[in-house]
């Protein structure tokens, strides 16, 4: 017993305190011997650092305690557990701890001395220098790549934040639109208002239509037709004055000739250009004296010409919004055109 005490007095304090701490049965819930009594296990590292380390070593650093164990040759048995083993650290045999020695740290001057004892050749030295330079370059490249990756990560995070803000703004805008549409659709008179608006819009489009070009063309064609008839009557009057010998012909033949021209005037094609015809020679039969007296005293076609100009002004100034077909009077009816033939009857 005295031998054991004497041997333990020469042991390092760390080993002595560690043995006492592990061998204390009151702390078996925190640290205890393993089943084979050749290693010890730290079951609760947090409580071990908080309660036991301050009591035996006056600090709470569990990592420092592990480094001390490594210094004295302890090794970890199970990577999943805090179990440490040393062949000379056995339960009930504290005297074996005298074989445990602290490892000497390796310092830089020791390496220099080792190199001095074993000098390198020139080729080995150059090879090692090249390898060191290559490793430095690789290190610089890795650091640059790391910086680039870090910069890209920050930019990506900024883009994600911006997109989130835009998404939230769009969601709020969409909600406001949906709420407004729901409020508008909830009004009872909405459908009627929409129908009235569509009807007014259609009426405005119909009223804003320009005058039909086809109607204007028909007016121009009719005007040219009237001019043609005016010239025809004038030539007939002149030729009838020159041929006075033919005035004694039967009036019935003249009436028949004029009657033949009446249906022709009522069948004028308003959609075609007036044909250019050669004036036939005046009939040799006599005509009505009253008819030729009226032709010589009046300006044939003047009344019709004034009516044409008046009607064209009415067509051009029709801006009241009503349909052209409803208010326009087609003055090119056969009745107006046949005025010439009626005078002859």
UniProtKB/Swiss-Prot annotation:
Assembly mode: Homotrimer.
The encoding gene: HSFA4C
Motif (AHA1): 226-235
Triggers of expression: By heat and cold stresses and the herbicide 2,4-dichlorophenoxyacetic acid (2,4-D, auxin analog).
Identification of the protein by name: Heat stress transcription factor A-4c
UniProt motif Nuclear localization signal: location: 199-203
Tissue: Expressed in roots, seedlings and at lower levels in leaves.
Keyword set includes Repeat: yes
Primary location class: nucleus
GO terms classed as biological process: fruit morphogenesis; lateral root development; positive gravitropism; response to auxin; response to heat; root development
Post-translation changes: Exhibits temperature-dependent phosphorylation.
Keyword vocabulary terms for this entry: Activator, DNA-binding, Nucleus, Phosphoprotein, Repeat, Stress response, Transcription, Transcription regulation
């Amino acid at each position: 017993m005295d031998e054991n005490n004497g041997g333990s007095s020469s042991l390092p304090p760390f080993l002595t305190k560690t043995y006492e701490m592990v061998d204390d049965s009151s702390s078996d819930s925190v640290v205890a011997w393993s089943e084979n009594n050749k290693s010890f296990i730290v079951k609760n590292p947090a409580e071990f650092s908080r309660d036991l380390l301050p009591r035996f070593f006056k600090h709470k650093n569990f990592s420092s305690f592990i480094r001390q164990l490594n210094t004295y040759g302890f090794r970890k048995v199970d990577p999943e557990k805090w179990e440490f083993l040393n062949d000379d650290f056995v339960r009930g045999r504290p005297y074996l701890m005298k074989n445990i020695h602290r490892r000497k740290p390796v310092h830089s001057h020791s390496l220099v001395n080792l190199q001095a004892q074993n000098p390198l050749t020139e080729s080995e030295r150059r090879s090692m220098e090249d390898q060191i330079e290559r490793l430095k370059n690789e290190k610089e490249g890795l650091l640059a790549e790391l910086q680039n990756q870090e910069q890209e990560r920050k930019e990506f995070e900024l883009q994600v934040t911006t997109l989130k803000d835009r998404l939230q703004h769009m969601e709020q805008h969409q909600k406001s639109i949906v709420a407004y549409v729901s409020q508008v659709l909830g009004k009872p008179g909405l459908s009627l208002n929409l129908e009235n608006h569509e009807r007014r819009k259609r009426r405005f489009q119909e009223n804003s239509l320009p005058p039909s070009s086809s109607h204007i063309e028909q007016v121009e064609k009719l005007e040219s037709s009237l001019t043609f008839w005016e010239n025809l009557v004038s030539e007939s009057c002149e030729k009838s004055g020159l041929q006075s010998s033919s005035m004694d012909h039967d009036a019935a033949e003249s009436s028949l000739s004029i009657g033949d021209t009446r249906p022709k005037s009522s069948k004028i094609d308003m959609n075609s250009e007036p044909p250019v015809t050669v004036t036939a020679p005046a009939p040799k039969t006599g005509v009505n004296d009253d008819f030729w007296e009226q032709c010589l005293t009046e300006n044939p076609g003047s009344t019709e010409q004034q009516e044409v100009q008046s009607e064209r002004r009415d067509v051009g100034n029709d801006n009241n919004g009503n349909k052209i077909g409803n208010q326009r009077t087609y003055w090119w009816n056969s009745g107006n055109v046949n005025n010439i033939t009626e005078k002859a009857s």
